[in-house]
Amino acid sequence: LQDGVLKLNFNKNILNIKENDSRKMMECLIYSLTELEGIKGLILYIEDDLLRVFPNTNEKIPDVLTRDIGVNKLYNLNSFKNVSKTTIYYISQKEDVTYYIPVTILENSEKDKIEIVIEHLKTNPYAKTNLISYLKASTELSHYEILEQTVYLSFSPLLYEGISKEDMLETVKFSIALSLK
């Protein structure tokens, strides 16, 4: 690790992946490792050779891979103007364990990040997945302000409709906080 960049050297077994899974594997690797404190980017090697394309593709990659690459991407674009890229953390539950899954959404929007995050947490990200958000579609963000790196959000009373306070405190707060990070 040098200047926030972690260098990893893999053997050729990493190339044993289907072409259409290659990018997703790399995105997950980048997102997982840059979540660790002090790691801002990755440089990847395969048996001491710099990785210049996604495995089993011709798609070029930058020398230093960062979270700018996105993860689990959804595209909602109708032009190349005013494109925003926001990563929203949705919830997935398996048995009694709750996971927070990042989804990078690329869309045409002039809204700020807070408005985009709340808007997307009020909707379901994928029609056919187990990703959820406990933020109700009827919830309205009344007001927000940022003071000294702290975000204060005021919601309509509908925020608590049909949800236990425990679920509200944990899942909604964590999803919003991770998404605004």
Residue positions per predicted region:
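Bimodal "functional hotspot" detector
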Residues: 1-181
